């Protein structure tokens, strides 16, 4: 299964074949690629922290969109790349807060995460923002508020909701999307 389909879809398809040689290899390879893709935002975060000289544990991360997908609307958390990112950041000691257009604060707390009470204030306080689903409300978030602190901030746009050039034009913002990160320093 290509794209961000639920992991169960390719696994159910594979289990429906009785002969091991008849297993749908392509769907299983796609599943592996999807699992690896959910680590990409974390690799960007690590590279960003290294390049700007900020210890990972000192960072405040705002993860926007922990539902599996934003459109059509759902509060389904199964297979959520947003959850993968949030939990991995927490394991690194990063202060993580969550906002989702559909998932309730109670559901966020039940998932072991901290919901934001004021989205605008959370954006201002964040050192990095991870946009992890394509809910239409996510594209109306004012990421330019991130530049209110004196150091460079990271915007990971997992769904291409923002114009890269416009975001990069905001002083102090580093834009990243799957396969791209604003050049900061030579590696």
Residue ranges and their predicted role:
Residues 1-187:
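Structural/interface elements that position substrates and couple domains in central-metabolism enzymes
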């Amino acid at each position: 299964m290509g794209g961000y389909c639920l992991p169960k879809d390719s696994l159910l398809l594979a289990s429906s074949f009785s002969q091991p040689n008849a297993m749908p290899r392509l769907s299983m390879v796609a599943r592996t690629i999807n699992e690896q893709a959910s680590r990409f935002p974390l690799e960007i975060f690590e590279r960003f922290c290294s390049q700007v000289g900020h210890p990972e544990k000192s960072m405040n991360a705002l993860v926007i969109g922990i539902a599996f997908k934003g459109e059509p609307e759902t509060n389904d958390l199964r297979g959520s790349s947003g959850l993968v990112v949030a939990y991995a950041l927490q394991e690194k000691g990063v202060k993580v807060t969550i906002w989702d257009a559909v998932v309730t604060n109670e559901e966020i707390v039940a998932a072991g995460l901290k919901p934001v009470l004021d989205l605008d204030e959370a954006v201002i306080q964040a050192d990095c923002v991870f946009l992890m689903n394509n809910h239409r409300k996510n594209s109306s978030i004012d990421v330019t508020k991130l530049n209110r602190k004196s150091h460079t901030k990271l915007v990971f746009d997992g769904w291409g909701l923002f114009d890269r050039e416009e975001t990069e034009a905001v002083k102090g913002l580093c834009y990243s999307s799957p396969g791209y990160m604003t050049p900061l320093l030579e590696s």
